C-alpha cells in the first residue's frame, strides 16, 4: 500500500472545509473551528470522526490519576497531607504488618503542583474505601470572573471644566 507523504505546509491546507477522517490522527497541529464545534463536521458525513472538545476545561475541575499511587493499604491515620508553597505533599507510612507471605511495611511520598487559581484555604481531602485519595477545592474569583456580574462605578464631580466652553 502506497502512502503519500505531504509537505507540512500543504497538509490540511483546507482543514476547516474537510474534517478529519477516523484514522487521520493529527497530533501537534493547531485546532480548527470544527475541532471546537463538532456539530459542524457531523453535517458533512457520518463517516468522519467526531472531534471531542472537553467542556470541563472551564468547569473548575482538574484531575490527576495515577494507578500506582493508590493508597488502599493505608488508613487515614497513616496519611499526612499538607500544603507547602504551591504543592500538596502526601506522605503515607504504616508500621510493619503481617500478611500471607511474611511481614511488610509500606511508605511513599508524593508531591503535586496545585493550580494557581485554587483557593488553598478551603481544600478538602477524602479517602475512599477502594484507596483513592481525592482533593477538591473551589477556584478563586479572578478579576475576569468578577467582571461578568454587575459592578457599580462611582461618579465623582470635578470643579474645573475639562474642555473650553463653546461660543
From Swiss-Prot:
Domain sHSP as annotated: residue spans: 47-158
Protein name as catalogued: Alpha-crystallin A chain
GO cellular-component term (any): nucleus
Role, per record: Contributes to the transparency and refractive index of the lens. May act as a chaperone, preventing aggregation of various proteins under a wide range of stress conditions.
UniProt-listed Pfam families: Crystallin, HSP20
Biased segments, Basic and acidic residues type: 147-161
Keywords, sorted A to Z: Acetylation, Cytoplasm, Eye lens protein, Glycoprotein, Metal-binding, Nucleus, Zinc
Residues bearing carbohydrate: 156
Positions contributing to Zn(2+) 1 binding: 94, 96
GO biological process entries: lens development in camera-type eye; negative regulation of apoptotic process; protein refolding; response to heat
Principal localisation: cytoplasm
Residues that hold Zn(2+) 2 according to the record: 101
Subunit-level organization: Heteropolymer composed of three CRYAA and one CRYAB subunits. Inter-subunit bridging via zinc ions enhances stability, which is crucial as there is no protein turn over in the lens. Can also form homodimers and homotetramers (dimers of dimers) which serve as the building blocks of homooligomers. Within homooligomers, the zinc-binding motif is created from residues of 3 different molecules. His-94 and Glu-96 from one molecule are ligands of the zinc ion, and His-101 and His-148 residues from additional molecules complete the site with tetrahedral coordination geometry.
Binding site for Zn(2+) 3: 148
One MF annotation (Gene Ontology) recorded for this entry: unfolded protein binding
Subcellular location: Cytoplasm; Nucleus
N-acetylmethionine modifications at: 1
PANTHER family: ALPHA-CRYSTALLIN A CHAIN, HEAT SHOCK PROTEIN HSP-12.2-RELATED
Region (Disordered): 143-167
Amino acid at each position: 500500500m502506497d502512502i503519500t507523504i505531504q509537505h507540512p505546509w500543504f497538509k490540511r491546507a483546507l482543514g476547516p472545509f474537510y474534517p478529519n477522517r477516523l484514522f487521520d490522527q493529527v497530533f501537534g497541529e493547531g485546532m480548527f473551528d470544527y475541532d471546537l464545534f463538532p456539530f459542524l463536521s457531523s453535517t458533512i458525513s457520518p463517516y468522519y470522526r467526531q472531534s471531542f472538545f472537553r467542556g470541563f476545561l472551564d468547569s473548575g475541575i482538574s484531575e490527576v490519576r495515577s494507578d500506582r499511587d493508590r493508597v488502599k493499604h493505608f488508613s487515614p491515620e497513616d496519611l499526612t497531607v499538607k500544603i507547602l508553597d504551591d504543592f500538596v505533599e502526601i506522605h503515607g507510612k504504616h508500621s510493619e504488618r503481617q500478611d500471607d507471605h511474611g511481614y511488610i511495611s509500606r511508605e511513599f511520598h508524593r508531591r503535586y503542583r496545585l493550580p494557581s487559581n485554587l483557593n488553598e484555604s478551603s481544600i478538602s481531602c477524602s479517602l475512599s474505601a477502594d484507596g483513592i485519595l481525592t482533593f477538591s477545592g473551589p477556584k478563586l474569583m479572578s478579576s475576569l470572573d468578577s467582571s461578568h456580574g454587575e459592578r457599580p462605578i462611582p461618579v465623582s464631580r470635578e470643579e474645573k471644566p475639562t474642555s473650553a466652553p463653546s461660543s
